[in-house]
Amino acid sequence: MKIDEVRGMTPDQLNEQLVALKKEQFNLRFQKATGQIEKTHRVDEVRKDIARIKTVLRAKQAQA
């Protein structure tokens, strides 16, 4: 997910996306622990996407 895509979202959309990514991160952690994960790079991608969303949410809250 690109930062421009994240900045274009509303706070409600960002919160929904954040919840979805946290669920995915939880599932990926279990897959990694059991050795079932195929795309290991996805763990890092999800973590960085969560950070991007949190950063943009924080910036939007500071503006309001």
From Swiss-Prot:
Q: Which GO terms describe its biological process?
A: translation
Cited InterPro entries: Ribosomal_protein_uL29, Ribosomal_uL29, Ribosomal_uL29_CS, Ribosomal_uL29_sf
Its Gene Ontology cellular component terms are: cytosolic large ribosomal subunit
Keyword Methyltransferase in the entry? The reply is: no
Keywords (alphabetical) are: Ribonucleoprotein, Ribosomal protein
Question: In the UniProt record, does the keyword Signal occur?
Answer: no
Which family does the record assign?
Answer: Belongs to the universal ribosomal protein uL29 family.
HAMAP family on file = Ribosomal_uL29 (MF_00374)
The protein's name is Large ribosomal subunit protein uL29
Q: What organism is recorded for this protein?
A: Phenylobacterium zucineum (strain HLK1)
Gene of origin? rpmC
